[in-house]
Amino acid sequence: MNRFDNESRRTAEARNGNGGELGAAARELSKIAVEENKRTTGLSQRAAYRKRLFEMRRGLNGEYRRNYALAAGSVFCGAVGEVLVNEYYRVEKQLRIAAAEAESLKFGRLPCFAAGEAAGSLRCAVLAKKLCELCGGAPGIGSVVEFFDEYQQNKPLTTREIQLLPAMLRRAELETLYGIVCTAGDGPLGTGRAAALQNVLAAL
C-alpha cells in the first residue's frame, strides 16, 4: 500500500472517529471550522445590514422616501429583534444604537412603529415601540399603540379613531404611514386601511 493510500485510510479513520489522536484532532478541527463558519456568517450578515442602511441613507428623497421606513423596520428587526423578546433588557445597548441610526436617518417615531407592524411581526412591533421610547417618545403614544393593536386584529377604523388621528399624528407622519400601508398591500394593515387614511388626509 503506497503512502497516498495510507494517508487516505488515516483520514477516513479520523473522519469516522477511529483514529486515536488523529481522530481527536480532526474532531477538534471540525469544531473550529463550524465556529469559524458561524462567525464569518455573522460578519457577512452585519455587513449586509450596514450596506442596506447606507443604501437607505442615499435614498431618503424622491421615490425611495415612501418605502425606506418599511425597509428600515425590517433591518432593525433582523439585527436586534431576534433576541428582543427573551432578552429584552440585555439588548438595551443595541436598541440605543438602533435608535441612533433611526435618528441619523431622520426616521420618525411613528413611522418606525408602523414599519414594525407592517412587517407583520410581534417582535418588529415590540422593537419599534421601544425605539419610539428611546427616541424620546411622543405625546399620545399610548393611544397610537392602542391604535396599532387594532390594526393587528384587522378591525375597521371607527369614526372616533379617524377623528382622533390628526390630533395624535403630524400630517407628515400620516403621509408616511399611508405610504407604508400602500407598500404593505394585502398584509396585516389591509387595503381598507389605505382608504381610511386617505380620508383622514383629505380632511386635514
Ranges and model annotations:
Residues 107-110, 185, 189:
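Structured alpha-helical bundle/scaffold domains in large eukaryotic membrane-trafficking regulators
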Residues 163:
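Mid-to-C-terminal catalytic subdomains of enzymes
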Residues 120-160, 169-188:
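Active-site activation/catalytic loop segments of kinase-like enzymes and analogous catalytic loops
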